[in-house]
Amino acid sequence: MPAAYAITVQVSQLLKDGYMEAVDIKQLESFDAGCLFAQAEGIIPAPESCHAIAATIREANKCKETGEEKVILFNLSGHGLIDMASYDKYLSGDLVNYELTDADIQKNLDEIGNLA
């Protein structure tokens, strides 16, 4: 099993134990954040990193509103040079937010159950 899959158990446990929280970041918000980061830092972030950047921006804005001072840490997992097609779609307005419906999720879970 690749290490990336093994880490999900640890992350899930940290979430369950209250050491971290999960947030919902839509695709367009994540690319907004990625482009802002690229303009500010000169690094085009990988799309998966853009979600962390967006959550960091949200948290920083909350601190700005409340006056709270805190250290905010995020993980930049890599550059986005391999996935420039996604940035091209975003910048040309062709990228949309997509959400699975509950029915889609249930259908996929049912199919996974049939694999056992």
Per-range role (PLM):
Residues 1-43, 89-116:
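Active-site/ligand-binding loops adjacent to catalytic centers
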Residues 6, 29, 51, 76-81:
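Glycine-rich beta-alpha junction loops
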Residues 25, 46-48, 75-77:
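Generic beta-strand/beta-sheet core signal
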Residues 43-44, 65:
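Intrinsically disordered or highly flexible coil/loop and linker segments, enriched in small
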Residues 44-56:
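Substrate-binding/catalytic subdomain of NAD(P)-dependent oxidoreductase enzymes
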Residues 55-116:
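Catalytic phosphate/nucleotide-handling subdomain of diverse soluble enzymes
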